[in-house]
Amino acid sequence: MMIDTRFPVYSLLERAADLLVHILGLLALGCGVMWLVHTALLSHAAVETGVTLLYCGGILGTCLSSAAYNFCPSCRLKGGLQRVDQSVIFIAIAATYTPFILLGGRGMASRWFCGLLWAMALAGVVLKMGFFTWSRRFHVMPYLCVAWVFFLCPDPPVWRLPGTTFPLLVLGLVFYCIGVVFYMRPRMPFSNVLWHVMVVLGAGTHMAAVGALLLYCARTPPMG
């Protein structure tokens, strides 16, 4: 009984709806990953291919870890999966911004800033994996700090991302922030389901933004 109280308890209908969201989300994002990898490989450029594979790995990793944690029965293993699930989010955030920073900027400032972003993400992983109970007092703030630090990027070309790339990037962030509102209200019916719906929408929108950037890079000389 003590183990059960460590984790949120949802109704059968909520769990069924959440399972449906995870299945549809994995299928949709899986198709998106295949499209992105195909598009990146057509460029025959190491940077485009590398950042795309990194991004796709981060997105799939967070989807799979979320499914593993949310649908594992309450037991000792679930506690470990919870740490992994909350840690991988930092990796996914850094992996999401990497294509925009390195392909959008390509200057030395972008490279240093990308390194700073990953250092923050890895610090978040250490925080969650090594100091999980203590880290919970900060709730979602570490994630928001890593997510919004992108807008401090000092390389001007990053702010001139082509076409629909930047609007899609911002829209994805809006979806995530709406999701955080649901996440912060665990007693609201279907809050966990709505949180995951917003995550899928945010990830899908960012995936479209990465795709738009890859298509632009394939048609034009390197930026920056």
Regions from the PLM with identified roles:
Residues 1-224:
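Multi-pass alpha-helical transmembrane bundles in non-GPCR membrane proteins
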